[in-house]
Design a protein with these regions (language model features):
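Short active-site neighborhood of thiol/selenol oxidoreductases, capturing the structured segment around
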Residues: 52-75
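Structural microenvironment flanking redox-active thiols in thiol-disulfide oxidoreductases
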Residues: 74-130
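Thiol/selenol-based redox catalytic cores and closely related redox-interacting motifs
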Residues: 120-184
């Protein structure tokens, strides 16, 4: 009981103080842009290449901050609920996170996710998509002391991805883009399915 109470207090402290950061989404890739190719490892250490996935069909890319974020977990669960519909459209769903594989695997298992979760080490891919922001010093200190963010991500840069979801056509064109600096707002999973249906 004490551990549960402690966890609740920690999360409340983080999400009350760590509200909206100065996240600039103006540089993020948008609808109509071409995606940047990448190769990242999944939670099992296997390499996954975007171009290879696009040869099979459309791809849904979704970024989340980490398994420690309740809003991220909720968004991932909602996508999991729509996974059958996503696959029915011939699409592949891929989640990207700066967390190290051990932590991304925990998130995948905790939420019973049946889609790929890739480690975007040092936010390199997120950066190329214009989705990286830096925590302010006060928030970074709280995240580190309460969540040990550097241990989760393998870096002390205090950078996180802006939560975003893209529907990418087979030619690499972004047909739907949802990028919101407010981490409490995420793309609706059912909307993602509807956007995929438009590609046919």
């Amino acid at each position: 009981m004490k551990n549960v109470l402690k966890s609740v207090i920690v999360l409340l402290a983080i999400f009350v103080v760590g509200t909206l950061q100065a996240q600039d989404a103006s540089k993020a890739l948008k609808q109509g842009d071409k995606v940047k190719d990448f190769t990242l490892k999944n939670a099992k250490g296997e390499e996954v290449n975007l171009s290879v996935l696009l040869k099979k069909g459309p791809v849904v890319l979704t970024w989340y901050r980490g398994g420690w974020c309740p809003y991220c977990n909720l968004a991932l669960k909602q996508l999991q609920e729509e996974l059958a519909q996503i696959k029915e459209q011939g699409a592949t769903l891929v989640a990207l996170t700066p967390e190290l594989p051990d932590h991304s695997l925990t998130t995948q298992e905790k939420n019973a996710l049946e889609f790929e979760v890739l480690t975007d080490l040092h936010n390199e891919v997120a950066r190329s998509y214009g989705l990286v922001f830096k925590l302010d010093p006060q928030t970074a200190e709280r995240y580190e002391s309460m969540l040990h963010l550097s241990a989760h991500n393998g870096t002390d840069s205090s950078e996180l991805p802006i939560p975003a979801t893209y529907v990418v056509d087979t030619d690499g064109t972004i047909r739907y883009a949802y990028v919101n600096p407010d981490y409490k707002q995420r793309a609706d999973a059912k909307t993602v399915v509807e956007e995929l249906k438009k590609l046919k």
